[in-house]
């Protein structure tokens, strides 16, 4: 399976004072998986095999619930093409 990019914006329904704390738990989990990722101010973009990345999205929902969110809204963007696509080929010239 070709390399793709998945961006995840996760919005757990928790008290404002806990929002960053819960999102940080999700980012820590993403980091622990070993996939290439970049954290942005509005979303985290990951690079890898689509099945692996979608499993990470699923687990990220579960982490929010485990952390006390009554509801989780997520916006997921997928960039997938034959032959694969990397974050570097899209934004490398800006680094």
Curated annotation (Swiss-Prot):
Alphabetical list of InterPro entries matching this protein: MTH1187/YkoF-like, Thiamine_BP, UPF0045_domain
A cellular component term, taken from the record's GO annotations: cytosol
Top-level taxonomy: Bacteria, Bacillati, Bacillota, Clostridia, Eubacteriales
Classification via PANTHER family: UPF0045 PROTEIN ECM15
Stated family: Belongs to the UPF0045 family.
Name of the protein in question: UPF0045 protein CPE1503
Pfam family, one: Thiamine_BP
